[in-house]
A protein has these predicted regions:
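N-terminal localization/anchoring segments of enzymes in phospholipid and broader phosphate metabolism
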Residues: 1-363, 367, 371, 411, ...
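Glycine- and other small-residue-rich loops at beta-strand/loop junctions that grip anionic moieties
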Residues: 187, 381-382, 416
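A short, conserved beta-strand element enriched in hydrophobic/aromatic residues
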Residues: 293, 379-380
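A general structural signal for well-ordered alpha-helical packing
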Residues: 362, 369, 390, 403, ...
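Helical hairpin unit composed of two closely spaced alpha helices linked by a short loop
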Residues: 382-403, 408, 413
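Short, solvent-exposed amphipathic alpha-helical segments in soluble enzyme
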Residues: 392-396, 422, 490-491
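C-terminal structural cap/anchor segments
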Residues: 401-405, 410-462, 466-467
């Protein structure tokens, strides 16, 4: 009891310290933005010539945005804001919408990738074999390999966990077997009850000489960790790095967060899924009813893709470690396990970056939707999607595919939940059936196509995940785990309320519809 009380006290202290630091940074950034706006407005009012030039420049910028080869959903909000409020719009676009301003961090990623990508080689015989079995599936794998630089494998076993706590228990068991290295990359870590068990194992393995590294996102850990967390981890032999520190200076990269959830053990076993390392994900706490999350465990060669993802982010955020051989060799040796050699199907872990202009995560979803013939099941905590995604889901339903979309019954963010629901009517009128998970908050991110192809990972169906965050997932076909994924969807549908008829005619309340239209307009920028 005393230990738990002390832990709660430490957690409260962490919350206070981290929120204070973030609040200070946010205030400093707002003051800087305010100062720039005041200066621009003064200049704008000072001279009619400056006013005219600003308006003309706003028009030029708006035309340039219109001509960009980007998603139309991103263009419209910027064009409206810039033309309606030239000074404000130009300032905000210059600070947050101009990706070219991130050339320094983009160069860092390019330098690291130049070393890593040549080491991740695709076995062409696997692609040829898949081409003979199903050309459309081979095309999907070819896309992920060519534009994501992550190979597809056929010697990897996959285990699906329909509940976060089941995956977590298996992670603890596998960590006990670690002999060489442990990599953890998570969006959010809470130094509370769940993490305490993990911390004990990490300390034990570090004492045995196992190399242990943790990478976590600064914003994701707001209210969970303070700066001294790194010192506490270092004291037990665990190396830590923070992804994209929040600083009290204007920084366009601050909007791009590491939303990945990856654990790699000796390059042989890897985990990912929707859950972070915080109590609410394992229903130790219940802020939004029952928390429903899922995950997968990979054993075999495909784990190398996870290793590459981690090493990329680790090296970008600090001093580069170019001794990759020992980590990659371990991944290759993992396939020597006899059980893995008998693994069925194809597995392709992949990652997505907001900096390369290629929305791999969204395109993996779109490719699955386009190839669906009989049924397509989708689980996502947020449904804020592009016109293209809406159209493809609708077309699938129109050509006779049974399309089922499941979202939470209890939201974690009420405003975002309202925006999610605003997309229902556009889908159900095209034949898509929509369900809400009544026991609580559905946080799983997974898609199942025709009962034989699926993806599970961290990628929400919203603009933040699809365009702003660093994400990861696992594409799989013909694996035994897919039967478990299908069973999980069947259980989800049983536990959910169908709301299709309720939204078939759209909302009648004009005020609500007006608010939702505004939120949908700015959603791509959030």
């Amino acid at each position: 009891m005393g230990k738990k009380k002390q832990m709660r006290s430490e957690v409260k202290g962490n919350v206070k310290n981290s929120i204070g630091r973030i609040a200070f940074a946010a205030l400093a950034v707002l003051l800087q933005i305010g100062w720039i706006l005041i200066l621009m407005i003064k200049l704008y009012q000072y001279s009619s010539v400056i006013s005219l030039l600003t308006s003309l420049f706003a028009l030029v910028v708006a035309l340039r945005i219109y001509g960009k080869h980007t998603n139309a959903a991103f263009k419209m909000p910027w064009i409206i804001v810039i033309l309606a409020f030239p000074v404000f719009g130009l300032c905000i676009y210059g600070l947050f919408g101009h990706k070219e301003a991130m050339h320094k961090i983009i160069r860092k990623f390019e330098d690291v990738d130049a070393q890593l990508i040549p080491l991740n080689v695709q076995d062409e015989t696997i692609l040829q074999q898949l081409e003979q079995e199903d050309p459309l599936l081979a095309n999907q794998c070819h896309y992920i390999w060519k534009y994501g630089n992550y190979p597809v494998y056929d010697t990897t076993a996959v285990k699906f966990y329909p509940e976060a706590y089941l995956g977590y228990e298996e992670q603890l068991k596998e960590l006990e077997k670690a002999r060489h290295f442990i990599f953890l990359e998570y969006h959010a870590i809470e130094e509370a009850e769940a993490f305490a068990r993990l911390k004990d194992v990490l300390a034990k393995k570090a004492a045995e000489g196992v190399e242990v590294r943790i990478l976590y996102d600064d914003v994701g850990c707001i209210g969970f960790l303070d700066k001294s967390f790194i010192d506490r981890m270092n004291a037990i032999g665990v190396q830590c790095r923070v992804f994209n520190y929040v600083v009290p200076f204007l920084n366009i990269f601050m909007n791009n967060r590491d939303h990945r959830k990856i654990m790699v053990i000796d390059g042989k076993v890897g985990f990912t899924g929707g859950y972070n390392l915080a109590d609410e994900y394992f229903n130790i706490t219940h802020p939004y009813g029952y928390w429903k999350d899922t995950g997968v465990k990979l054993t075999g060669r495909a784990v190398q893709n996870f290793t590459m993802m981690f090493l990329e982010m680790w090296n970008v955020m600090g001093q580069a470690d170019t001794h990759y051989e020992k980590y990659l060799k371990a991944s290759q040796e993992g396939a020597e396990d006899g059980n893995v050699q008998k693994a069925s199907g194809y597995v392709q872990p992949y990652a997505d970056s907001p900096l390369d202009g290629e929305p791999v995560g969204e395109n993996v979803y779109l490719n699955l939707i386009k190839t669906a013939k009989k049924r397509l099941y989708v689980a996502t905590p947020y449904l804020i999607i592009s016109d293209e995604m809406t159209r493809e889901l609708g077309l699938a339903a129109k050509r006779g595919v049974a399309v089922r979309v499941i979202t939470p019954g209890i939201p974690d963010k009420k405003i975002i939940y309202g925006v999610t629901r605003s997309y229902y009517s556009g889908l159900v009128r095209q034949g898509v059936r929509v369900y809400e998970y009544t026991p609580g908050f559905l946080h799983a991110k997974q898609m199942l196509c025709d009962g034989d192809t699926a993806t599970v990972g961290t990628i929400n169906m919203d603009y933040r995940s699809l365009y702003h965050h660093f994400e990861n997932g696992v594409w799989m076909h013909g694996c035994d785990a897919i039967r478990d994924i299908e069973a999980d969807f069947d259980k989800l549908l049983q536990d959910s309320e169908e709301v299709t008829d309720k939204y078939r005619d759209g909302r009648k309340n004009m005020a609500v519809r007006g608010w939702q239209c505004i939120m949908r307009l700015i959603a791509p920028l959030l």
